[in-house]
C-alpha cells in the first residue's frame, strides 16, 4: 500500500515557549524541537480519529527509526510557535510524518523535519500497520484542514 508524498491535511499545534525549554544561551534547546514533533504527531493522530492511546491499547506501537530536524531560526522564551504536522507517507509497515515549526504570525520557519516509524506489536516485533489504523490515518487529504477543536 505505498502512498508516496500525497498532500495530506496539516494539523497545527500552538505552543508558547516555556522558560524550562530554553538553554543557557536563552534559546530553545535543540532537544525540545523533537519533543514538539512528538506532540504534533500525537495531536495529528487524535485529530485524524486515531488516538495513539487506541493504537497502543490494541497492542501496537510506532517505533522511531529515522528522525531529521533542520534548525533554521532561533526560538526564545515566550515566543509563540506552531507545529504543523502532516502525514508524509504510509507503507505496509512504515509511517512517515512531516513537520514544520513556524511563527504563527509571520509564517517564518523555525525548523522542519520528519520522523519515520516502523509498526511493532506488543513484543516489539515489526508487523504490518493494521488496516483499521491505515484507513483512519489516510482519512483526510489536502484541502480538508484539521481543526484544533475537532
Predicted features by range, described:
Residues 2-47:
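Catalytic strand-loop segment that frames the active site of acyl-thioester-processing enzymes
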Residues 2-13, 46, 75-77, 87-150:
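HotDog/MaoC-like acyl-thioester-processing domains
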Residues 14, 29, 63, 70, ...:
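Conserved beta-strand segments that form the floor/walls of ligand-binding pockets within enzyme
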Residues 15-19, 71, 119:
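Hydrophobic residues in beta-strands and at strand termini
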Residues 20-23, 40, 50, 57, ...:
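Residue-level signal for pocket-adjacent positions within structured domains
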Residues 33-36, 63, 98:
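Residue-level recognition of specific faces of alpha-helices
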Residues 44-95:
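Hydrophobic beta-strand-centered segment that forms part of the acyl-chain substrate-binding groove
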Amino acid at each position: 500500500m505505498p502512498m508516496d508524498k500525497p498532500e495530506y491535511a496539516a494539523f497545527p499545534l500552538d505552543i508558547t515557549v516555556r522558560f524550562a525549554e530554553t538553554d543557557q544561551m536563552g534559546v530553545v534547546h535543540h532537544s525540545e524541537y523533537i519533543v514538539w514533533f512528538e506532540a504534533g504527531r500525537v495531536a495529528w493522530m487524535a485529530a485524524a480519529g486515531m488516538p495513539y492511546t487506541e493504537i497502543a491499547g490494541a497492542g501496537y506501537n510506532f517505533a522511531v527509526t529515522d528522525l531529521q530536524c533542520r534548525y533554521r531560526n532561533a526560538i526564545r522564551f515566550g515566543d509563540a510557535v506552531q507545529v504543523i504536522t502532516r502525514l508524509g507517507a504510509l507503507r505496509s509497515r512504515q509511517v512517515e510524518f512531516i513537520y514544520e515549526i513556524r511563527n504563527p504570525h509571520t509564517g517564518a520557519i523555525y525548523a522542519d523535519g520528519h520522523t519515520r516509524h516502523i509498526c511493532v506489536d506488543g513484543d516489539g516485533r515489526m508487523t504490518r500497520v493494521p488496516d483499521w489504523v491505515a484507513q483512519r490515518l489516510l482519512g483526510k487529504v489536502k484541502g480538508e484542514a484539521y481543526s484544533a477543536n475537532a
